[in-house]
Amino acid sequence: ICSRGVFLQKKRYILHILDDEGISVDKFKYTGVEVVRSTMPKALKPHVKNIIETMIHTKDYNTTNKLFNEMYELFDTLSLDDIAFVMGCKSYSTISQNTGEECNNFKTYKGMPIHAKSAYYYNHLLEKQNLTNKYESVSSGDKVRYFYCKQPNKYGIGSMGYKYNFPKEFSNDIHPDREKMFEKIIFSVFERLYEAVGWKCRKPGEMVQTDLFDLLKL
């Protein structure tokens, strides 16, 4: 038995459960949504769930939005490891064969998956900077962490991957685009949830500007 829930589409929903096969409970069931997928960074999941559960419990826009804004501020303080996407490179050996034929330096082939492309950039830069003895390359079966890069950058790349730790030797030339990361990981999730309940979701950075316009009647 559930008291309420949010339904996004078939097999994608969140329910507040009060009775589980005759046992009284107070829990949430997440099905098919990003917060239960392995691609969402683990460090972010408790915060995302807290906002979702507040949204369902209170049904109050201002209370929920306050937590959403706090999440935006928190996101900017987290380490790269805490916000990077994580995905398995199951067939990197096949992809790397293609890179040898179709990729030239930092130019990749059309349709290359972003996590594979990011792993390729990482491996390529390790070789380019003679760091293969210091850091492990990404191979088939490995998990790769990846993130969107600030533009412009020295290599003209949109994303970068790494295996365990992001090499400090790369940090002068490559920086994470935290605004874009927040948009892809957090904002996109709540944009769909807000829309499902008839709320308007605005990016926290844009809220202040909009509120000022309202205040000044511009």
What are these regions (language model features)?
Residues I1-L218:
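DNA-dependent DNA polymerase catalytic subunits
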